[in-house]
Amino acid sequence: MITGDFAEALVLYWLSKHGYECACVDHTGIDLIAFKKDGSERMGISVQGRSRYPGTEKIAVNLHQFQEARVPCELFGLIPHAAIVVDGGKVIRCFLLPLDYLETIAGGKKVRVWPMTERFLEARRNDQKVRWFELAEHAQSRWW
């Protein structure tokens, strides 16, 4: 619950920071709606957040059923997207991409997954269809 709420809030913040109008809708299949003010882009976003314990950072993320996001997006005239937020210990990664494209690159057969190998992540960083950002812990702190 905490990880999911954090992931949704982080995606909302980042989209808003970059000029999108956003709303948390918590509708079956989608969590967020975001659109450009000029109306040129309207997204229904299913957010998937995962936290990782030390040593488990490379474990793939199991993905939601894609069809659940398509139904409300069709009803509301939105393009279905997925946001995948993963806490990898010293870095939090967020990826945002169209669901149609995610289906072509997601691994797995029965259960679809987002691999967390460095090779896969580097390919996504260089992929023009994937928007992404990383928050890294570089500064010193006194936080436990």
Residue map of PLM features:
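Mixed-charge (Asp/Glu-Lys/Arg
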Residues: M1-T28, A34-W144
